[in-house]
Amino acid sequence: MAKMYYDSDASLELLQGKTIAVMGYGSQGHAQAQNLKDSGLNVVIGLRADSRRWKQAEAAGLKVATVAEAAAQADLIQILLPDERQASVYEKEIKPHLTAGKCLVFSHGFNIHFGQIVPPADVDVFMVAPKSPGHLVRRTYEEGAGVPGLIAVHQDASGRAYDLALAYAKGIGCTRAGVLETTFKEETETDLFGEQAVLCGGVSELIRAGFDTLVEAGYQPESAYFECLHELKLIVDLIYEGGISRMRYSISDTAEYGDMMIGKRIITDETRKEMKKVLAEIQDGTFAKNWLLENQINRPSFNAIERKDAEHPIEKVGAELRAMMPFIKKPGE
């Protein structure tokens, strides 16, 4: 059974008197930094000098400096930049200030696991990964709760890396809900697989395929949108609350029979074989190599596919229907 840790297992005293530099002020950066600050810890945000987020961070009452300046004054350096930018920023602006006894912190293991960042042996390297988007990390903290998270230690130079990881997790509110001990390898590979095969890649293609099937058969696009996209949230909420069995308990017997009889015709043995290939490409570094190369050549495939998918009919129909639904929050609200 995996080991879980809670508030009683962690002490913020380990971080008292230390400076925590949070590099980046995006979804996770703003949430983790504000939670750490509200936990009574000393936080500085590291940003580019021309970053549009500089004033946002200052408005939230946070100290802001350039990445290099923040790294120089920090005892713990949390890198919350996009995966594809981390290695370059680390080499140029963080590594020169990563002196013995400091801690390097991550919320995703990509760059450590795939060898893009190789820290010196005399620093602690650990991960605290909230299993939630940043806005929920912040909101639940403010409500007195928290979101679950993962912790892992890659390098324990001080002999206290696990305790420091737990303290950091407590500072952002994750130990209120519980944190699971894992490894950089496990977090990285399972996270990428979940995104590609299920949560993002799998779901996106399933939705579009269902929509296309109905529209090509002559059904109204609006009806296809409701059946294949809009109602997905209702089903996912049930699964989130109590697993697949809870969802099946809550739907009609007709829907449950269709689930049991037809599901395996959609996710076939061939699909499962392809999932194993996807996982193998993550494990052997093929995906990481392709993604890093894609960024080095200015993302030609990424940009082309993004533009093409944005023009899919489901996007236009969805925008029109959502405009009629005042109960749906608009982006940015």
From Swiss-Prot:
Q: What EC number(s) has UniProt assigned to this enzyme?
A: 1.1.1.86
PROSITE patterns, per the entry: KARI_C, KARI_N
Molecular-function GO terms, alphabetical = ketol-acid reductoisomerase activity; magnesium ion binding; NADP binding
| Residue span, KARI C-terminal knotted domain | 183-328
Binding of Mg(2+) 2 occurs at D191, E227, E231
Q: Which reaction does it catalyse?
A: (2R)-2,3-dihydroxy-3-methylbutanoate + NADP(+) = (2S)-2-acetolactate + NADPH + H(+); (2R,3R)-2,3-dihydroxy-3-methylpentanoate + NADP(+) = (S)-2-ethyl-2-hydroxy-3-oxobutanoate + NADPH + H(+)
What pathway is this protein a component of? Amino-acid biosynthesis; L-isoleucine biosynthesis; L-isoleucine from 2-oxobutanoate: step 2/4; Amino-acid biosynthesis; L-valine biosynthesis; L-valine from pyruvate: step 2/4
**What is the protein name for this chain?**
Ketol-acid reductoisomerase (NADP(+))
The species this protein belongs to is Desulfitobacterium hafniense (strain Y51)
